[in-house]
Design a protein with these regions (language model features):
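Feature captures the FAD/FMN-dependent oxidoreductase FAD-binding
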Residues: 72, 135-136, 140-144, 196-244, ...
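Ferredoxin-type iron-sulfur electron-transfer modules in oxidoreductases and energy-metabolism complexes
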Residues: 17-35, 57-89, 106-133, 262-263
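A conserved FAD-binding loop/helix module that cradles the flavin
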Residues: 433-460
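Glycine-rich dinucleotide-binding loop and its adjacent helix/turn
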Residues: 119-135, 192, 197-211, 239-301, ...
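FAD-site-proximal beta/loop scaffold in flavoenzymes
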Residues: 248-279, 363-437
Length: 463
C-alpha cells in the first residue's frame, strides 16, 4: 500500500566507508525529503511529539517541508532545538519520536530524524540563522560546559534576552559532540562547529580553556563576576574500568581517551606529536553506542576489530542502526563473552585477553537477563590494543569546589528533573553531570528544563 515504506536514505558503500572518516549517511535531497514528508498523516493528537525530549512541533515542520517551505520548517524546529543538525544524525529516533509514529503500526514510521537533518542542513547551506532576542533583559547567567546540555540551556536563555556566557574546559566548543562522536557519524566542521556558531549568533559568548573549579570557582562567578545564576552541564567524562589484572598495561585505553585523541586531536594523522597506538588487532569491551564508535574508528585506522560483550545481541544497548553499520563494515561481534584478564608482555604492552564465555540467567534490576559465567570455558585471544567502553561518571572537580552542592553516591549532582535546581541557590544542573552517561537528546531536554527553571527563578527575584 502507498505510504507504508519510507524513502530510503543513501549511504556510502560499507567496503568504501570502512577505509575513510567521511560521513556514512548522505541524507535526503529536496525531492526525497518532500516525498518522505508527504507520508506524514499530520495527526491532530501527534504522538510523535510526546516522544521528543525537546518538544519539537514535528507535524508543523514536516508540513512545511511537504510544501517546500524549508526556511519556515527550520524556524519551527529552532524554536525548540538548538542542535537540529546534530539531533537529526545521532538521536535514537526509533525509540522516541519515530517509535510513537502512527505510521509505524502498519509499515515504516515517518523518517522524522532524516527530515530534521535535511532541514537543518538546508538552512546551513542557505545561511539561515535562528531568530535572536530583540533586547537583553539585564540578567547574567553562566553555563559550564558547551556540550548538548550547555548549548541548549544557553540558547534558550539567550532567546529570552539573558546575557549568557559558556565556560568550556577544552580548546574547542561542543563537548561530547566534538570529542566523543566520530567524524563519520557527526562531521565536526560542517555540522558541530556550525551549530555552535548558531548558538553564538543568538548572543551567547563562549570562553574556552576555562576549567571551572581550577581557573575559577562557581562561588567566584556568582560573588565576583556578577552572574546571577549558573547552569552546570559539564557532562560525565571519567571512564570506568573493569578492575581486572592487566588494565594498567600499555595499549589499554578508555573509549573516552581513544575517541578524544582521534576526534578532537586527530592523533591518527602522520606527524602528530603524540601519536595514538591503535594496533593491528583491537578488542573493544562493551556494547553501547560509544563501543560501536570506538570499534568503527579503530577499523578505519586499519585494525581487525572484535567487540566483546557479556550479553547477547538482543541485549546490546547500542542503536540497531549502529550495530548494523558496524557489522556491514566487518567488525566481529564476540557475544556472551567477558574478559577476565589482560595479558601483558615482558615490556608492559598488551599481548592478548583471557576471556570467559557467559550464558544468560534471570533478569537483573535493569530488566535485562543477567550474564552468568560458564565454568571451564576460558580461552585466550591475541590482540595488541584493548579499549574499555563501560560507561563514564562525572568529574568531581566542580562539586568538590562548590560549597553546598549536593551529590549522590555516584558523584552525580543532585538536581530536580523539572527545573534542574540543585541544593545551592541559583545553581542549576542537567545532562550527564546529573544522570551519568546518557544520550545527546536527553541532555538537551535537561538543558531546556533548566533554562525554564532559571528564567522562573530570576523572574521571581526581579518581582
Amino acid at each position: 500500500m502507498e505510504g507504508l515504506v519510507r524513502v530510503p536514505v543513501r549511504e556510502q558503500e560499507p567496503k568504501v566507508r570502512a577505509t575513510n572518516f567521511e560521513e556514512v549517511c548522505y541524507g535526503y535531497n529536496e525531492e526525497e525529503a518532500v516525498a518522505e514528508a508527504s507520508r506524514c498523516l499530520n495527526c491532530k493528537n501527534a504522538q510523535c511529539m510526546k516522544g521528543c525530549p525537546v518538544s519539537i512541533n514535528i507535524p508543523a515542520f514536516i508540513a512545511q517541508v511537504k510544501e517546500r517551505n524549508f526556511e519556515e520548517a527550520y524556524h519551527i524546529i529552532s524554536e525548540s532545538s538548538a542542535l537540529p543538525a546534530v539531533c537529526g544524525r545521532v538521536c535514537p529516533q526509533e525509540s522516541q519520536c519515530e517509535g510513537k509514529c502512527i505510521r509505524g503500526f502498519k509499515g515504516d514510521p515517518v523518517a522524522i530524524g532524516k527530515l530534521e537533518r535535511f532541514v537543518a542542513d538546508w538552512a546551513r547551506e542557505h545561511g539561515i540563522k535562528p531568530k535572536k532576542a530583540e533586547k537583553l533583559n539585564g540578567h547574567k547567567v553562566a553555563v559550564i560546559g558547551s556540550g548538548p546540555a550547555g548549548l541548549t540551556c544557553a540558547g534558550d536563555l539567550a532567546k529570552l534576552g539573558y546575557d549568557v556566557t559558556i565556560f568550556e574546559a577544552l580548546h574547542r566548543a561542543g563537548g561530547v559532540l566534538s570529542y566523543g562522536i566520530p567524524e563519520f557519524r557527526l562531521p565536526k566542521d560542517k555540522v558541530v562547529a556550525a551549530e555552535v556558531e548558531n548558538v553564538k549568533a543568538l548572543g551567547v559568548d563562549i570562553e574556552t580553556n576555562v576549567v571551572i573549579g581550577k581557573s575559577v570557582k562557581i562561588d567566584e562567578l556568582m560573588e565576583k563576576e556578577g552572574f546571577e545564576a549558573v547552569f552546570i552541564g559539564s557532562g560525565a567524562g571519567l571512564p570506568r574500568f573493569m578492575g581486572i589484572p592487566g588494565e594498567q598495561a600499555n595499549g589499554v585505553f578508555s573509549a573516552n581517551e581513544f575517541l578524544t585523541r582521534n576526534n578532537l586531536m586527530k592523533a591518527f594523522e602522520e606527524g602528530y606529536e603524540t601519536p595514538i597506538s591503535h594496533g593491528k588487532k583491537v578488542v573493544v569491551v562493551g556494547g553501547g553506542n560509544v563501543a560501536m564508535d570506538a570499534a568503527r574508528t579503530a577499523l578505519r585506522l586499519g585494525a581487525e576489530v572484535h567487540i566483546i560483550y557479556r550479553r547477547g545481541e538482543e541485549e546490546l544497548p547500542a542503536r540497531k542502526e549502529e550495530v548494523h553499520h558496524a557489522k556491514e563494515e566487518g567488525i566481529i561481534f564476540d557475544l556472551l563473552q567477558n574478559p577476565t584478564e589482560i595479558l601483558v608482555d615482558e615490556n608492559g604492552w598488551v599481548k592478548g585477553v583471557r576471556i570467559i564465555k557467559m550464558e544468560l540467567g534471570e533478569p537483573d534490576a535493569s530488566g535485562r537477563r543477567s550474564p552468568v559465567e560458564i565454568p571451564g570455558s576460558e580461552y585466550e585471544m591475541d590482540c595488541d590494543t584493548v579499549i574499555m567502553s563501560l560507561g563514564t561518571s562525572p568529574n568531581p572537580l566542580i562539586s568538590s569546589t562548590t560549597k553546598g552542592l549536593e551529590t549522590n553516591r555516584r558523584k552525580c549532582i543532585v538536581a530536580t528533573e523539572d527545573t534542574g535546581a540543585t541544593s545551592k541557590d541559583g545553581v542549576y544542573a542537567g545532562g550527564d553531570a546529573v544522570t551519568g552517561a546518557a544520550t545527546v537528546i536527553l541532555a538537551m531536554g535537561a538543558g531546556k528544563a533548566a533554562a525554564k527553571g532559571i528564567d522562573e527563578y530570576l523572574s521571581g527575584k526581579n518581582n
